[in-house]
From Swiss-Prot:
Gene: truA
Pfam families: PseudoU_synth_1
HAMAP family: TruA (MF_00171)
Protein name as annotated: tRNA pseudouridine synthase A
Primary role: Formation of pseudouridine at positions 38, 39 and 40 in the anticodon stem and loop of transfer RNAs.
GO-annotated biological processes: tRNA pseudouridine synthesis
Species this protein is from: Chlamydia trachomatis serovar D (strain ATCC VR-885 / DSM 19411 / UW-3/Cx)
Amino acid sequence: MTKKIVLQIAYQGTSYSGWQYQPNALSIQEVLETILKKIAGFRISVISSGRTDAGVHAQGQIAHFHCPDHPHFTDPRQIQKMLNALLPHDIVIRDAVMTDEDFHSRFSAIAKEYRYTLSLLPKPLPHHRLFCFSPRYKLNIARMQEAAQYLVGTHDFASFANLGREYSSTIRTLYTLDLSEQEHLVTVICRGNGFLYKMVRNIVGALLDIGKGKYPPEHLLDMLATKDRRKGPPSAPPYGLSLHHVCYPPPYQWFCKHEHNNSSEGK
C-alpha cells in the first residue's frame, strides 16, 4: 500500500533555478528528489503547491510524494529528520505528515500568501541583503497602501501576468494586499486564491511606481482595465519575494490552522 507524505519546506532560493527541475541548473525539486532516492534506493517524484522562480524564497512551501512501504518511510518525523540531516543548509523540512490519497499539494490548496520585502535603506543591512530589495529612492508608503486596496477583490489580473504563458483564466481573487512597515523594512503581504506567473512581483513593481510618485494610486484601476502587461512597469526583483504559507481546507490544515482560521477568505 502506498503512502502520501506531505512536507512543509523552507528554503533560501538564492542559489537555485527555482522549484522546478531544470536540465542545466540546480533546482529545489532536484535536490529533494536526489536525497529521497539516496534514502529509498529508487526515484521518488516530489510535487509542490507551486513553482517558485529562480531566486525566490519560501517559508512554507508545501509538497507531497508517494512512496511504497519502506522501512525508512514509516514515520513522518523520521523522514523529516533524515531529510534535514542530508539537505544543504539553505533547505529545511519544517514539518512532515502522512495523509490520504485525496490530498494534492497544488490542487487542494485554497489560498496562498506571498510576502515581498523592501528595504528603505540605500544599502540593505548585510543579514537582509539576500532577502529584500532596496529601490534606493524615497517611497510614500501611505500612497502605496491606498493604491493596494484597488487590487483587493476579484479582478482580471491580465495586466499583472507575464507574457509567454497561456492561462485558462486570468481572473483571480486577492483577499489581502497590505503593507507593513517596521523600522527600515516594508513587507508587502499578498494573499489570494491563486497567482499568475510573476503576478506578485508585477504588483510590487506597480506599487513602487506609485510610491515614488510616478502615478497616483488610482492608476492601478487603469492598469486593471487595460488587460495589457506590456503597458505595465518592470517586475520587482525575485530575491525580495517569499512564499510564506499555503492554506488547505479541512482536514488538511496541519501547517496553517491559525492563519486559515483568521484569514478573510474564511469569512
